[in-house]
Structure formats: C-alpha cells, structure tokens
C-alpha cells in the first residue's frame, strides 16, 4: 500500500504549539471522564457501598460477558449543568454483550441525587431507548432511582419528549418483541417504580430493592399509618403478593446473575460475533 505523503513540518513552532494545545485538551477529557466515573463522589459513594451496593458501571461489568466490550453513550451528558452535580446526567447507558447477545443498558446512579431524573437524564434515557428500537436490542434496566428531580419537575414532565415518554417507549418496545428486563437494586419511587412494573421480566433484591409510588414518610403524612419500606414495597411483597416483580434475589450479586440468566434464555440470536 502506498504511503500518503504529508507536508506538515513537525519541526515548526506552529506544529509544536498545536500539538501541545491538543494534548492539553486530551488530558482535560481524561480528567472529565475520570470524574464522572466516580458518580456523586466522596460520602455519597461511601454511603452507597455501605448498603452493599455496586456503582452502575460495576453492575454492568458483572452482567456483561468477561472481556467483552462495552460501548458507553454520552459519558459527559450534563457536563457543566446543574452546578456540576449531575455527572453523566445521573445515568449510565450503552451497549454490552451478554451471552453473546448485544443488549442496551440503562443504569441509574444513586450516588447522584439518589438516581433522580434531571431534564438531561430523561433525554439520555429516551435516546438509549431509541437506539434499542432502531437496532432491535433487548433493554436491561438497572433501577435505583427516586424518580423525577422535584425542584425541576416543571422541566421533566410536561412535553412529548419528557418523562412519560420513557414508559410509552417501554410499552412500544415490548409490543415489538424487544425484551424489557429490569433489576430493582435500590429504591424505586414514584416515576422510578414504573420501569420494573412495565418490564417483561423484573428482579428485585431483598432489603435494598423497593417499589412504590410514595415512600413511608408520605404514607404517614397522608394516612397516619407507619409502615417500613420493606413492608410497603419490598422484595417479599412484590414477588409473593402483588406480582409486580418476577424474581426474588437475596443480594445484588444474585440479582445480576439472574439478569444474565434471563438474557441467556431470550429467544434471540446474536447479531454478530464480537
């Protein structure tokens, strides 16, 4: 193969100046990416781990085939927005390989404002579903979310491309035969509760996993009744009584293995060998 000649003078001051400038930008990008991978950082990550929970990218890595690639979308979403409090818009999305099958992941980051949805979070979630639709990819939702970020709810709910579109998309994708699989790994409150409820198969973790539209404090305020989160919407309630969830997991590791088992038994063929 012929080599393409270049007229760039690598010895010129201009070339060295441009090189240093672009290397600086590359270093800046690395710093940004390192920051977002730490989620909410500091005490929020520590508190998250004390509850026996993994970070979202760790959860995805546990589900994906060992050594397989993961293509993450929009790592820098919401960069510079919301006073810098919402790294990656509080959600990790991308394509991973599970039992040789390409799957679309949507994983809430509970270290970022409890996994609540900012306007950019909604946009990123819907974009991931659009990619699933266009490429016929099963969706895996790793749910750990308090629903909409209430101080900005006027920017989250009202429009056609806002929060409600997520649930509409789940119904449409399921109707097209694109599997919707959810693992409830933390609190799923308000809007966050609809994702596992509308999935084709859902898994919930004992202790950490809860599904309800309103948590115990709101129940007490509205009715005067005192109830624990586990009794109100825990794993036992939803697998043995309500039927909202299909599989009971003793811990997070077991839940992630169950996700792999569900995908293994999906009646779909791998798109290509990766």
Task: Go through each PLM region and give its residues.
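Amphipathic alpha-helical segments at domain termini/boundaries
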Residues: 1-76, 213-274
């Amino acid at each position: 193969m012929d080599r393409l000649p270049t007229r760039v003078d690598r010895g010129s001051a201009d070339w060295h100046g441009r090189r240093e400038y672009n290397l600086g930008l590359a270093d800046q990008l690395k710093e940004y990416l390192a920051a977002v991978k730490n989620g909410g950082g500091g005490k929020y990550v520590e508190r998250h781990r004390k509850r026996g929970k993994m970070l979202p990218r760790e959860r995805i890595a546990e589900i994906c085939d060992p050594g397989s690639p993961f293509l993450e979308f929009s790592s820098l979403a919401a960069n510079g927005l919301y006073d810098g409090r919402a790294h990656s818009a509080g959600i990790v999305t991308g394509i991973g390989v599970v039992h040789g099958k390409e799957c679309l992941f949507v994983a809430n980051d509970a270290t970022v404002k409890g996994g609540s949805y900012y306007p950019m979070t909604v946009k990123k979630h819907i974009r991931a579903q659009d990619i699933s639709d266009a490429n016929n990819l099963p969706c895996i939702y790793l749910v750990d979310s308090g629903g909409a970020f209430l101080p900005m709810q006027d920017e989250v709910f009202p429009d056609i491309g806002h929060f409600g579109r997520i649930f509409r998309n789940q119904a449409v994708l399921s109707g097209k035969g694109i599997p919707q699989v959810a693992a409830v790994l933390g609190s799923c409150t308000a809007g966050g509760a609809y994702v596992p409820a509308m999935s084709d198969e859902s898994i919930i973790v004992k202790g950490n996993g809860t599904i309800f539209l309103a948590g115990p404090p709101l129940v007490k305020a509205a009715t005067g009744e005192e109830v624990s989160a586990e009794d109100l919407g825990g794993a036992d309630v939803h697998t043995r009584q309500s039927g909202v969830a299909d599989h009971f997991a003793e811990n997070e590791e077991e839940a992630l293995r169950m996700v792999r088992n569900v995908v293994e038994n999906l009646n779909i063929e791998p798109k290509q060998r990766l």
